[in-house]
Regions:
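Small beta-barrel nucleic-acid-binding modules, primarily SNase/OB-fold domains
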Residues: 1-146
Length: 146
């Protein structure tokens, strides 16, 4: 496990973020895609309109918690990358008493605990989470995230 400072470049969805990673001594890795380790968030890019609402709410939670250009701490969880070529890691948030973003996402019902098991095994928990998430009109506006 390694720890780096990084700048938030783009929130792709509730469990994927693009960052610039500071390796130290003026060396940066630019536009690296990070998959949040240990969680699964609803999809924001799907034709399922109901799931999309919750996926956009999850994405908004991440955007509000880690604004663009903010500096965060990234802890990589495994050497290398996951099956889709993304870095696997967690964000430790200095503005939130060093809480981990993945744990905040689960606590606030924007994601479920996930470690590679079948998506069918976590479907019920995603549905239960919907009972706790408030969908704001901003999330439903297609221009909100552009």
């Amino acid at each position: 496990m390694y720890e780096y400072n990084c700048k938030i470049v783009k929130v792709v969805d509730g469990d994927t973020v693009d960052v610039d990673i500071d390796l130290g001594f003026g060396v940066w890795m630019r536009n690296e895609r990070v998959r949040l380790y240990g969680i699964d968030a609803p999809e924001s890019r799907t034709s399922d309109k109901e799931e999309k609402k919750y996926g956009l709410a999850s994405k908004k939670f991440v955007q509000d918690t880690m604004p663009l250009d903010s500096t965060q701490t990234l802890r990589t969880m495994k050497d290398g990358v996951g099956k889709y070529g993304r870095i696997l890691g967690v964000f430790v948030l200095p503005d939130y008493d060093n809480q981990r973003l993945d744990e905040m996402m689960i606590k606030n019902h924007h994601a479920v605990d996930y470690h590679g098991q079948s998506k069918d095994d976590i479907k019920e928990q995603h549905l239960k989470n919907r009972e706790h998430v408030v969908i704001l009109e901003d999330v439903l506006n297609p221009n909100y995230f552009r």
